[in-house]
Amino acid sequence: IRRYCDPRVCDRECLEKGKYFGRCIRDICKCN
């Protein structure tokens, strides 16, 4: 688990999981 959430990395990881996009909330990657 990263301490700092990079929005671009989060977004790409969420896309790979089949989600539309990801955003960082309190340094945690949330997929939508």
UniProtKB/Swiss-Prot annotation:
Keywords from the UniProt entry: Disulfide bond, Secreted
Record-annotated membrane-spanning stretches: none
Main subcellular location of this protein, as a coarse class: secreted
Signal peptide as annotated in the record: none
Disulphide connectivity of cysteines: 5-24, 10-29, 14-31
Domain of life: Eukaryota
Annotated compartments: Secreted
Stretches assigned to coiled coil: none
Tissues/organs with expression: Expressed by the venom gland.
One GO CC annotation: extracellular region
UniProt key word Disulfide bond: yes
Further information: Negative results: has no effect on voltage-gated potassium channels Kv1.1/KCNA1, Kv1.2/KCNA2, Kv1.3/KCNA3 and Shaker IR (with inactivation domain removed) and on intermediate conductance calcium-activated potassium channel KCa3.1/KCNN4. Does not show antimicrobial activity as well.
Domains: entry comment: Has the structural arrangement of an alpha-helix connected to antiparallel beta-sheets by disulfide bonds (CS-alpha/beta).
Family affiliation: Belongs to the short scorpion toxin superfamily. Potassium channel inhibitor family. Alpha-KTx 10 subfamily.
Protein name from the UniProt record: Peptide II.10.10
Source organism per UniProt: Centruroides tecomanus (Scorpion)
